Regions:
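A helix-boundary/kink motif common to multi-pass secondary transporters
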Residues: 104, 166, 295-296, 323
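"…together with the soluble PPM/PP2C metallo-phosphatase catalytic core" -> "…together
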Residues: 1-262
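Extracellular/periplasmic helix-loop-helix junctions in multi-pass membrane proteins
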Residues: 313-331
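Generic hydrophobic alpha-helical scaffold/packing signal
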Residues: 208, 234, 256-259, 266, ...
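Cytosolic, membrane-interface loops and tails of multi-pass inner-membrane proteins
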Residues: 28-53, 266-298
Length: 379
């Protein structure tokens, strides 16, 4: 594993600049949050804090990130980077308004799609996916007209997935920093200068805010920060990961963002199995499970940091090792995921899902019998 030494200086400066600006801006943003009433008041059992805490910390992260980008990334003749930053500004403005007055979910979703379309229509798009079937003669799936909708789905999905894991002090911020650091390492290995500097700025901005966000948190980053981090991670992963053609390239971004992706997927499946809306808020996320298993907030967050770090390290191995080693690693990770799911999803939940499926099956049988009776009566 070798890094491009010429990139180390700008990467280090970008990281340090974002860290300092983010750290210094947080008290300023905290004061602003109190003035505009952007305060998170615990109102239900999903909240893990017991006293009002100011939101809008994402503004400090955004300030640190932008300061570093404007200093170390030349965006003047770079329409792709311009489109990413424009979309990010829309996401941040949306987040600020939502943190202050709580916007309707449908409106937020529509605006997120608009923000995602900006980079998707300006070259930041998933053009092809590697075929996971290693026995197929076609190594890649060229998306053609599906490129834009799949790109928008990816960006909006990751944007919301990061927001959904923002349930414990420092969790989403730390996991995002680990994910960004992973992309940074891969970009350094592949000599992708722009991606490396942008990810360094994101890591620095996250780390600068982290002292205020770790348990017990003095400030939350709110939707402003969580959706911004998800947006940047999703768009930059397209720039730095999806465009590399390799048999296992489809797995790399999913590993790097594995924690928010799998937690969100399991949450939606669980809710639909219980007859609820996929967007219905509940206390079934992985961080809630760990708390219910007896861990305190710091232990739960540390556990998820380790999991995210292992996934990130696996992604680096996938990009640097041979294809045979990569496939073996993927198989091993799948086995670990199955075992972990049995631990994280306790017996009671499995029984609930089983009962729900039985009820649906019985309902189907009753409807079939009623239909048969109607048919016989007509005869």
């Amino acid at each position: 594993m070798r890094f491009d030494n010429q990139l180390m200086a700008p990467v280090a400066l970008a990281l340090l600049t974002a860290l300092v600006v983010s750290f210094l801006m947080t008290p300023v943003v905290k004061s602003f949050a109190y003035k505009v009433g952007a305060i998170d008041v615990p109102k239900d059992e999903r909240r893990m804090h017991h006293k009002p805490i100011p939101r809008l910390g994402g503004l400090a992260i955004f300030a640190g990130f932008m300061a570093s980008i404007l200093l170390f990334v030349d965006i003047r003749l770079n329409p792709q980077m311009q489109s990413i930053l424009l979309g990010a500004v829309i996401i941040v403005v949306l987040g600020v308004v939502d943190d202050i007055m709580a916007l309707p979910a449908k409106l937020k979703f529509v605006i997120q799609i608009v923000a995602a379309l900006i980079p998707a229509l300006n070259g930041v798009s998933i053009q092809a996916l590697s075929n996971p079937n290693i026995f197929s003669p076609n190594a890649y799936w060229v998306l053609n007209w599906l490129s834009v909708p799949i790109t928008v789905l990816w960006i909006v999905g990751i944007t919301n997935a990061v927001n959904l894991i923002d349930g414990l002090d420092g969790l989403a911020n730390g996991v995002s920093a680990i994910s960004a650091a992973t992309v940074l390492v891969i970009a350094l290995i592949c000599s992708e200068a722009q991606v490396a500097v942008v990810m360094a700025a994101l890591v620095g901005a996250c780390v600068g805010f982290l002292p205020y966000n770790l348990n017990p948190a003095k400030m939350f980053m709110g939707d402003t920060g969580a959706t911004f981090l998800g947006f940047i991670l999703s768009t930059m992963s397209i720039q730095g990961l999806f465009k590399f053609y390799a048999v296992i390239s489809f797995a790399v971004p999913f590993l790097i963002l594995g924690l928010p992706i799998f937690d969100t997927a399991f949450a939606m499946i669980r809710r639909m199995a219980h007859g609820q809306s996929p967007m219905h808020a509940d206390r079934g996320h992985i961080h809630h499970r760990l708390i219910d298993m007896g861990l305190n907030q710091k232990q739960a967050v540390a556990t998820l940091y380790v999991i995210s770090g292992i996934l990130g390290l696996s992604a680096v191995v996938l990009t640097t090792g041979g294809e045979a080693k990569a496939m073996l690693l993927l198989i091993a990770l799948c086995v670990v995921a199955v075992v972990a799911a049995r631990v994280v999803f306790p017996k009671e939940v499995k029984e609930e899902l089983h009962e729900e499926l039985e009820e649906l099956t019985e309902l189907g049988h009753h409807e079939e019998k009623d239909k048969q009776k109607e048919d016989s009566s007509h005869e």
